[in-house]
């Protein structure tokens, strides 16, 4: 199953109700689960983003639907990254031909 990294920032609405964010996280995890998406990890972060989440979804379309639904609630804005495992990374890099002019 593909892995995605979601970078979240609280909106003005979200930060005003920050004490309710753990309950919203639980509800979001359950809604994702019902959609076939697994919220594997959620981290409170210091810096540019307020939360970083590791998410598995069956495909890009399912993930996009879930993350857009999350954003539409107005508590967070999101930026998403598709992630590749270390094994996938090694396979991708290993497939690079020595002569890059032969793409």
Features from the language model and the residues they span:
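A compositional/biophysical signature of low hydrophobicity enriched in polar/charged and small residues
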Residues: 1-103
């Amino acid at each position: 199953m593909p892995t995605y990294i979601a970078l979240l920032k609280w909106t003005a609405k979200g930060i005003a109700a920050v004490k309710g964010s753990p309950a919203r996280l639980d509800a979001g995890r359950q809604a994702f689960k019902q959609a076939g998406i697994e919220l594997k990890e959620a981290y409170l972060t210091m810096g540019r983003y307020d939360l970083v989440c590791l998410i598995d979804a069956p495909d890009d379309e399912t993930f996009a639907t879930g993350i857009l639904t999350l954003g539409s609630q107005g508590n967070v804005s999101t930026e998403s990254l598709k992630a590749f495992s270390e094994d996938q990374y090694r396979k991708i890099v290993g497939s690079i031909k020595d002569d890059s002019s032969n793409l």
